[in-house]
A protein has these predicted regions:
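His/Asp/Glu-rich metal-coordinating catalytic cores
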Residues: 1-116
Length: 118
């Protein structure tokens, strides 16, 4: 499988067929996440597909790059895309998390922090 895999850096124009070009951009979501910008024909139609994106810079990642010259079609898959999905303030979440961990440790408890693999 690795012999059939190629890496494409962000910003590189890649011909995937005679009339379709692909440019990947940072999605800011997780390491290696990308938006896919397809130029179809001679730029007559531009299609962008992405999964989750993040506009705010994090401690690890830059924010998503959405500087496209032109887009006619946009398709976004998202975990938190509904109106009621309000993300809490990062500092508030971190403070609550640290306080909870410190409270458990102060009482002699153990803290297990499971991290899902993506």
């Amino acid at each position: 499988m690795m012999r059939q895999t190629i890496t494409i850096p962000y910003g590189a124009v890649t011909d995937i067929s005679p009339d379709i070009k692909l440019v990947l951009s940072n999605a800011g979501h997780i390491l290696g996440s990308a938006t896919c910008h397809f130029h179809i024909g001679n730029g007559e139609h531009n299609f962008v597909y992405t999964g989750d994106i993040k506009y705010g810079k994090s401690m690890l990642l830059e924010s998503a790059n959405t500087n496209y010259p032109r887009v006619e079609t946009l398709l976004i898959e998202s975990t938190y895309g509904a109106k009621e999905d309000i993300q809490p303030d990062r500092q508030e979440v971190e403070s609550t998390f640290v306080a909870s961990v410190n409270s458990v440790l102060k009482e002699g408890g153990k803290v297990l922090i499971p991290i899902p693999a993506v």
